[in-house]
Amino acid sequence: MDWHTRYTQQATWTRDLRAYLFKKAGLNQARRVLEVGCGTGAILSELVTSASLHGLDLNPAALAECRIHAPKVSLVHGNGLSLPYPDATFEIVYCHFLLLWVRDPLQALVEMKRVTKSGGYIIAFAEPDYSHRIDKPDELIQLGKWQTESLQRQGADPGFGARLAESFFEAGIKINETGTIQGVEKEPSPGEWEIEWAVIESDLAGFVPGEDIQKIKRLDQQARARGERVLHVPTYFAWGQV
């Protein structure tokens, strides 16, 4: 599985939102900016700013690839639950499709707050809520159930997105704005569909028989060809101030 391709695809879903929120948060005036869970650098590689950019991730392989895509960024191998930075270091700290994967998302937000300067901003650009996923036609509901179970097997919290704003509040972050991302469920191009199915096949391998995966993949393709496919996963964002 080419994860940089996947992360780059996810980055397209939030590009307009990121432009809006980074402007609101004063990206052009910031001196230091941190991405927690930077992965392969899909977001960092797109940032245009004079600020000193920093990225942290728990996966050494992802960081190695991030160095290729974002060579000017200061990268650190570390855990979001215990950030290896002094208090009040950054003007902006953000994450992207991260908190659902974190064992203790509230602690991660507390740490993000700790390393953010007074008056600085914390942004969570995208956190999905798979517990309210919609799949149509009904024959594809099973796919959603499988994917949700797969996330749980991998240690994720599929319903975290709906609790994002609550978690900001509990972490003591003053919320400026929160809501759901619009347009994530738009009809994918053939290439995007193949990327999506590469992720599905990777996730389901080992606990769903291969023939069942291929059967539901054909059903998905046929439903899209008939114009009947509906897939909606509510995906939340929040940004606030320290």
What are these regions (language model features)?
Residues 91-104:
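A short SAM/SAH-binding and catalytic strip from SAM-dependent methyltransferases
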Residues 12-31:
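Conserved alpha-helix/loop element of class I SAM-dependent methyltransferases that forms part
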Residues 81-92:
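A short acidic, Gly/Pro-enriched loop at the edge of an enzyme's catalytic core
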Residues 123-190, 205-209:
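Conserved catalytic/acceptor-binding region of the Class I
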